[in-house]
A protein has these predicted regions:
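Helix-coil boundary and N-terminal low-complexity module in membrane systems
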Residues: 1-120, 128-178, 182-217
Length: 217
């Protein structure tokens, strides 16, 4: 991504500067409100599918809108979420349900077998990172579902710093959510999806720039 940097402009002594803090505060509040809206949509449509058949398409639909938001698009959130939910109903279930099942099994074993907690925690962390890459990949690239997990795994292994950052952010979200459980209903899921998407789009752009510099398309 190319950025143009303008020459610095210095205000004369005594001149009033623009209230940048107010603008930043507004932008931060707008992002929190958006994450809360995304959270509500995710919960409603997960429940609409009876949880089991709703969580997959609701998750992929949320990532679809999060990507569009991160790329600066303007859209009507409710009809676009409904459209994405219907469009991704089958693929979302195929993508998310196996991930949720394996993560649930690992969490159960983590609590059931104290002696194996370290290897289980490592496996759980790696799977979380793979999911954190795979879901944004699913809505950003034209990839078939069977290719998503190998691609996400390779990306996780070749970009360790980015993977550690994603795992840190996810752990922070989980910690805050367990400390304040009401956030799960208000903000946690939508906030994580938007943060994950925002970070991954930048990781993808950096990777594409490196490949382009090497002459690899």
């Amino acid at each position: 991504v190319q950025r143009r940097v303008s020459p610095p402009i210095f205000a004369p002594p005594g001149a009033k500067t623009s209230p940048n803090w107010a603008i930043r505060l507004y932008e931060a509040a707008d992002e929190v409100a958006w994450a809360a809206k995304l959270n509500v949509f995710w919960i409603l449509f997960t429940l609409a599918g009876g949880v089991l058949f709703g969580v997959g398409p609701a998750t992929v639909a949320a990532y679809t809108l999060a990507r569009r938001r991160a790329m600066g698009e303007s859209f009507r959130s409710w009809p676009e979420f409904v459209s994405a939910y219907r469009r991704e109903f089958v693929r979302g279930s195929v993508l998310v349900l196996p991930l949720a099942a394996v993560i649930g099994l690992l969490v159960t074993n983590y609590h059931a077998f104290p002696a194996l907690r370290l290897p289980i925690a490592v496996a759980l962390g790696f799977l979380v990172v793979i999911a954190a890459y795979a879901l944004p990949m699913a809505v950003h690239y034209d990839l078939r579902t069977p290719r998503l997990f190998p691609k996400a795994s390779l990306f996780a292994l070749t970009r360790p710093a980015s993977s550690v950052l994603l795992l840190f952010v996810f752990t922070a979200v989980v910690f805050v959510s367990t400390t304040f459980p009401f956030l799960v209903l208000v903000l946690a899921v939508g906030g994580w999806i938007q943060l994950d998407t925002w970070l991954c789009l930048r990781f993808f752009a950096e990777n594409e720039a490196k490949l382009h510099a090497k002459g690899i398309s």
